[in-house]
A protein has these predicted regions:
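Catalytic machinery of carbohydrate-active enzymes
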Residues: 1-352
Length: 352
């Protein structure tokens, strides 16, 4: 493992511990937003003087980063044989952190093999779960990671466990200076400067900040800060990012298409992350870096529901409740961003 943090939560006695498996089988950001819930689950058992063997079920895409968390004791890749795999695991509890018909059908197939199965109550197929809890997530009264925590609290209540308090999440690289030098060498970047990561893409269908606005913001930051601007691209995003690079040739391009671990290593070395609401924004939150996210006002994609869990976060939306991301005033917001990140720049420089 290339990262450190949460080692004390690893299960040391698999044979005599309850086996709890958690399913979050959608996108990268959704999995990262489940991390506080997974930590809370582990902590609840420890506060009761017990251990829990924690497994997760994830898509193949998010598997590499799931394997990096020492408190996750087993990672299962979702495939067409998942039901058979889980039936053979002697699992005590299965928790679905989100519900769709595919997951409900899976739960129904496991009812005779797993004593306790929990999921959010949504739509008519919720009866397929052994136990479901109405959360009304579509109302967006809480963040996604808080909804995940609420499910864990239901499990804890049913199993006479405390609702554990969450420690601040701040993952770190084992050898940050070494990894920083490796990345700097790849990008021909100055290892001693402030690094600002910019990701202009989004993994969903929600409105995004136009490329022209990113160009304006990057120019503004480069003129006002002694920094390296690193353009981040993932699968299918390189061509558009190269087009952006033509407009800001002083920037560096870092392609993380082939490795989520490389994305995490980069985020560990950033002082500031800027981008639309997407998976990399949430990966950055693992390191408690400053982050700036651009969001539409529509409820289903709002900051209220999808903000990252790190404390130092600035969310920016179009004015007057609009969903037109082109209405965001970069000249005005650029000043706000500078004001937001300035107090922490000196301490980040000292850390390096």
């Amino acid at each position: 493992m290339d990262f450190v943090g949460f080692e004390d939560l690893k299960c040391k006695d698999k044979e005599n511990s309850q086996k709890v498996f958690v399913i979050r089988n959608d996108k990268l950001g959704d999995f990262i937003l489940a991390i506080p819930a997974l930590i809370a689950l582990k902590q609840a058992f420890l506060e009761k003087g017990k251990e829990v063997y924690l497994g997760v079920v994830v898509p193949s895409y998010t598997t590499p980063i799931a394997l990096e968390f020492p408190f996750i004791d087993e990672v299962i890749i979702e495939d067409n044989h998942l039901s058979a795999t889980l039936k053979n695991k002697s699992i005590d509890t299965l928790i679905f952190l989100f519900s769709n018909f595919k997951n409900a059908r899976l739960a129904f197939s496991l009812r005779k093999f797993i004593p306790y199965i929990l999921a959010p109550k949504t739509k008519i197929y919720s009866w397929l779960y052994q136990k479901s809890v109405r959360q009304s997530r579509s109302l967006c009264l809480k963040t996604e990671y808080e909804y995940n925590l609420d499910l864990i609290h239901v499990f804890c209540k049913d199993h006479n466990l405390p609702n554990a308090s969450i420690k601040k999440i701040a993952w770190k690289l084992k050898d940050k200076s070494k990894e920083r030098s490796i990345i700097a060498s790849k990008l021909n970047a100055d290892v001693g400067l402030l690094w600002i990561g910019v990701h202009m893409h989004s993994g969903g269908s929600s409105p995004v900040l136009p490329a022209s606005h990113f160009i304006e913001l990057i120019d503004f930051l480069y003129k006002n800060l002694n920094c390296e601007i690193i353009l981040i691209c993932g699968p299918g995003e390189r061509k558009a990012t190269e087009e952006l690079l033509k407009k800001v040739p002083f920037a560096r391009l870092y392609d993380t298409s082939h490795s989520l671990v490389d994305l995490a290593k980069l985020c560990a070395n950033l002082s500031v992350y800027i981008g639309n609401a997407s998976g990399p924004l949430h990966v950055n939150a693992l390191f408690d870096n400053q982050s700036i996210g651009f969001y539409p006002n529509e409820l289903s994609a709002s900051i209220a529901r999808w903000r990252p869990f790190n404390e130092r976060f600035l969310g920016i939306t179009p004015p007057n409740g609009s969903n037109d991301m082109g209405l965001i005033d970069i000249e005005k917001e650029g000043e706000n961003i500078l004001e937001f990140i300035a107090p922490n720049l000196s301490c980040h420089t000292q850390e390096r």
